[in-house]
C-alpha cells in the first residue's frame, strides 16, 4: 500500500489574462508525487510544464483546484508559510542558472541559509562542502562570469541543497549546456535521487526524460500520459541533510538583519558612482541644515555676548512715555533722590545714573569729538566692562569730585596711537582730565565715530555740564528675584515718587528673551528652506531605489524562490536606502565641518557654533528620509510575485 503522497494535485486549473484574452494554461491537472521519486515532466514548448513546475514549487498559485503538500492544503497557507515551504523543502535548479553575478560561488550557495537563519560559520562551511562534493573545490571564490555553464549549474544545484533540498525542481537544467556538461548534471541529479531526494525534472527532450524513473507527458495544458509511480522508492534522507536551525527567534531575526545589512553594503560599494550621486542630495541637504543651525547658534552667541555688555538682570529707566517720545527732553524728574531711593531697595543689587554729553576732547595738538558719560563707580561692574590696563575710578574719586576718567581701547588707539593712555592728561573744554584706566571697547561702540570717555557723574555735573537730573538710571536686580516683579515694584515706587508715570523701563531679560525668540524663528525659517534640499535628496534616493528594484527584479525572484519572505525583501531594500541616507548624512556633517573651518578662515565676525543637537538632527533626518523615501520602492520589491520576477531578464 502506497504511503501518503508528498505532493498531490486535484483538478488544478491555471489561467492567464481576463475576458476575451483569457487563456487556460493548465486544465484539470491531477497528479501525485511520492517522496523519493525521480519524475520527468516532458512536453513541447507551450504545453504548460513550466507553469506546472512553478505551481509545484509554490512560486505561483492555481486559480482552481487543490494542492496538498503532505496532506496540507496549500491555499490555506500565509505568504510567510509559503516562503518557509520554499526555504526548507524545495530547491530550484533553473535553465539559466539564476546566480547573482556580484556574488562568489560560496556566497550564491549561502543565500537560502541566510533566510533559514543558519549561523554564518555553519552556512559557509556547508556551502563549501556542497561545492566540493560537486567537484567545485577550486572554484569556491569564483564569480558566475568566471565559471563555465556546467559549473554554474552545479553551483545552482548546491544552492538547491543548502537547506536540505527535500524536493529538487529542475527546469530544463541541461538546456544551456553542452552534451558532456548535460550528462554531468543529470548524473548529479540521479545521485541526489538515490540519496533520497525527490527530483522533478522539467524538459522538452524525451532523451533527457528517459533518465527519470517516471515520465509524465503534457500537451496543451493537460497530462496525456503517465508511466506510473515508481515501485522501489528511495527512502528520503532529507532529515539528514537539512541543517540544524536556531530555535531562538530573536537570534534568527538578528542574523537576517545582519545579512541584509551586509548585502546592502555590498550593493552600495558595487555601484560606487551611482551610490555617490544618490547620496549627493542628502549630503548637500544635511550640510545645509547643520551649517544653518551652526550659523544661527553662532549669531545668537555673538548677539548674547554683545548684549551681556549691557549687563545681566538690568533694568534701564528713561524719561518719557516710550522710545522716541518728543517730550522726554523736557522731563527732569530722574534725579539724586530717585537714585538714593532705588539704592535702598532690598531687591536691587546696585544702581548707577548716566549723564551724557558730546564735547571736544584735546590731547596736545590733536582734537577729537568725544561722547562724555557721567556714571557712578558701580557702572563698570554692572555693565560688565573688562579692564585692560590701569584702574577704575572709585568711591573716593566720586566723593571728592576728582577729574579722573576711563576710556575704551578704540579711543586710546585714536588719540594715543600705540602708546598707553593710562597716566595721560586730556582736556575736555578747559578742564584737564587724568586717564586712570582703559577698558575693552563695548560692542555697540566699535563702529562709532566718536571717542568714548567715562567720568564720575558728579564731576561732570560740577565741572563740565551743569545738570541736576539724569538721562538714565540703570539698576541691577538680585539673582534670586524675578525681574518682572522687580520691574513692577520700580514702576510703582517711582510713580508714587513723581506723582505720575513720566518714565519708562527697559528690561534686559525681556529683551534677551525676545531676541532669542527672534533668532530661533529666523533659524527655523532658514532651516526649513535648507530642509527642502533634504526632501529633494530623499526623492533622489526614492528614484534610484525604484530603478534598483526594476534592475534587480530577477534577483528578488531568486531570493524569493530560495525562501525569502516579503518582509526579508522589504527589510533589505529599506536597509539599503537607510544606509545610503545615513552615509550621506555622515558625509554631510563632515562637509559642514569643512565649510565651518573655511568660514572661520575668511571671517571672524561670526563663528559657526556646531552643537551635538545639530548633528543628532542631521542623523535623525537622514535616517528618516532613507526610511520614508525608501519604503515605497521596498514595498514594491516585496510585493513582486516570484514567478513574474524570475521571468525578467
UniProtKB/Swiss-Prot annotation:
The keyword DNA repair does not apply. Keywords: Antibiotic resistance, ATP-binding, Cell inner membrane, Cell membrane, Membrane, Nucleotide-binding, Translocase, Transmembrane, Transmembrane helix, Transport. The chain crosses the membrane at residues 276-296, 529-549, 582-602, 612-632. One of its GO terms (cellular component) is plasma membrane. Its EC number is 7.6.2.-. Coiled coil: none annotated. It is found in: Cell inner membrane. One of its GO terms (molecular function) is ATP binding. GO terms for biological process: response to antibiotic. It is a multi-pass membrane protein. It holds the Pfam family FtsX. ATP binds at residues 43-50. Residues 7-245 form the ABC transporter domain. SMART domains: AAA. It comes from the Bacteria. Homodimer. Part of the tripartite efflux system MacAB-TolC, which is composed of an inner membrane transporter, MacB, a periplasmic membrane fusion protein, MacA, and an outer membrane component, TolC. The complex forms a large protein conduit and can translocate molecules across both the inner and outer membranes. Interacts with MacA. Part of the tripartite efflux system MacAB-TolC. MacB is a non-canonical ABC transporter that contains transmembrane domains (TMD), which form a pore in the inner membrane, and an ATP-binding domain (NBD), which is responsible for energy generation. Confers resistance against macrolides. PANTHER family: MACROLIDE EXPORT ATP-BINDING_PERMEASE PROTEIN MACB, MEMBRANE COMPONENT OF TRANSPORTER-RELATED. Belongs to the ABC transporter superfamily. Macrolide exporter (TC 3.A.1.122) family. This is Macrolide export ATP-binding/permease protein MacB.
Amino acid at each position: 500500500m502506497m504511503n501518503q503522497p508528498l505532493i498531490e494535485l486535484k483538478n488544478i486549473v491555471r489561467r492567464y489574462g481576463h475576458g476575451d484574452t483569457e487563456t487556460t494554461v493548465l486544465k484539470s491537472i491531477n497528479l501525485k508525487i511520492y517522496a523519493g521519486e525521480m519524475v520527468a515532466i516532458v512536453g513541447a514548448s507551450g504545453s504548460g510544464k513550466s507553469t506546472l513546475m512553478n505551481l509545484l514549487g509554490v512560486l505561483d498559485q492555481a486559480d482552481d483546484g487543490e494542492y496538498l503538500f503532505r496532506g496540507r492544503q496549500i491555499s490555506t497557507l500565509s505568504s510567510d508559510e509559503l516562503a518557509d515551504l520554499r526555504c526548507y523543502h524545495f530547491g530550484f535548479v533553473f535553465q539559466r542558472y539564476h546566480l547573482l553575478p556580484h556574488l562568489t560561488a560560496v556566497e550564491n550557495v549561502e543565500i537560502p541559509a541566510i533566510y533559514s537563519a543558519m549561523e554564518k560559520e555553519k552556512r559557509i562551511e556547508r556551502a563549501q562542502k556542497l561545492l566540493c562534493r560537486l567537484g567545485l573545490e577550486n572554484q569556491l571564490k569564483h564569480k558566475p562570469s568566471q565559471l563555465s555553464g556546467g559549473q554554474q549549474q552545479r553551483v545552482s544545484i548546491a544552492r538547491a541543497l543548502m537547506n536540505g533540498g527535500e524536493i529538487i525542481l529542475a527546469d530544463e537544467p541541461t538546456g544551456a549546456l553542452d552534451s558532456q556538461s548535460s550528462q554531468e548534471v543529470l548524473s548529479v541529479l540521479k545521485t541526489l535521487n538515490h540519496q533520497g531526494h525527490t527530483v522533478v525534472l522539467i524538459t522538452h527532450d524525451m532523451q533527457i526524460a528517459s533518465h527519470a524513473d517516471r515520465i509524465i507527458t503534457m500537451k496543451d495544458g493537460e497530462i496525456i500520459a503517465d508511466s506510473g509511480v515508481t515501485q522501489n522508492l528511495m527512502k528520503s534522507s532529507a532529515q539528514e541533510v537539512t541543517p540544524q536551525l536556531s530555535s531562538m527567534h530573536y537570534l534568527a531575526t538578528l542574523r537576517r538583519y545582519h545579512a541584509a545589512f551586509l548585502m546592502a553594503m555590498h550593493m552600495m560599494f558595487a555601484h560606487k558612482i551611482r551610490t555617490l550621486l544618490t547620496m549627493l542630495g542628502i549630503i548637500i541637504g544635511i550640510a545645509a541644515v547643520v551649517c544653518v543651525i551652526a550659523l544661527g547658534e553662532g549669531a545668537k552667541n555673538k548677539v548674547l555676548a554683545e548684549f551681556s555688555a549691557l549687563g545681566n538682570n538690568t533694568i534701564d529707566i528713561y524719561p518719557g512715555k516710550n522710545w522716541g517720545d518728543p517730550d522726554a527732553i523736557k522731563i527732569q524728574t530722574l534725579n539724586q533722590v530717585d537714585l538714593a531711593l532705588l539704592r535702598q531697595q532690598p531687591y536691587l543689587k546696585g544702581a548707577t545714573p548716566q549723564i551724557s554729553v558730546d564735547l571736544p576732547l584735546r590731547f596736545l595738538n590733536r582734537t577729537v569729538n568725544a561722547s562724555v558719560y557721567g556714571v557712578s563707580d558701580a557702572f563698570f561692574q554692572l555693565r560688565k566692562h573688562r579692564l585692560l590696563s590701569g584702574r577704575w575710578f572709585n568711591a573716593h574719586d566720586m566723593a571728592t569730585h576728582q577729574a579722573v576718567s576711563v576710556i575704551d581701547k578704540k579711543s586710546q588707539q585714536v588719540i594715543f596711537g600705540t602708546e598707553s593712555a593710562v597716566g595721560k592728561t586730556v582736556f575736555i573744554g578747559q578742564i584737564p582730565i587724568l586717564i586712570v584706566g582703559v577698558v575693552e571697547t563695548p560692542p555697540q561702540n566699535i563702529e562709532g565715530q566718536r571717542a568714548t570717555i567715562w567720568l564720575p557723574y558728579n564731576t561732570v555735573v560740577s565741572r563740565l555740564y551743569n545738570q541736576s537730573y539724569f538721562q538714565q538710571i540703570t539698576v541691577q536686580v538680585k539673582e534670586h528675584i524675578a525681574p518682572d516683579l522687580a520691574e513692577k515694584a520700580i514702576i510703582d515706587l517711582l510713580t508714587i515718587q513723581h506723582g505720575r508715570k513720566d518714565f519708562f523701563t527697559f528690561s534686559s531679560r525681556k529683551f534677551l528673551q525676545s531676541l532669542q525668540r527672534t533668532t530661533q524663528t529666523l533659524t527655523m525659517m532658514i532651516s526649513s528652506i535648507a530642509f527642502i534640499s533634504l526632501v529633494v535628496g530623499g526623492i533622489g534616493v526614492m528614484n534610484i531605489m525604484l530603478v534598483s528594484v526594476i534592475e534587480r527584479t530577477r534577483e528578488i525572484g531568486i531570493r524569493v524562490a530560495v525562501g525569502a519572505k516579503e518582509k526579508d525583501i522589504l527589510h533589505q531594500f529599506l536597509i539599503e536606502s537607510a544606509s545610503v541616507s545615513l552615509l550621506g548624512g555622515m558625509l554631510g556633517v563632515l562637509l559642514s565641518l569643512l565649510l565651518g573651518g573655511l568660514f572661520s578662515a575668511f571671517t571672524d565676525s561670526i563663528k559657526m557654533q556646531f552643537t551635538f543637537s545639530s548633528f543628532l538632527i542631521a542623523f535623525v533626518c537622514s535616517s528618516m528620509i532613507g526610511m520614508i523615501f525608501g519604503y515605497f520602492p521596498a514595498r514594491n520589491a516585496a510585493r513582486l510575485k516570484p514567478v513574474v520576477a524570475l521571468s525578467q531578464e
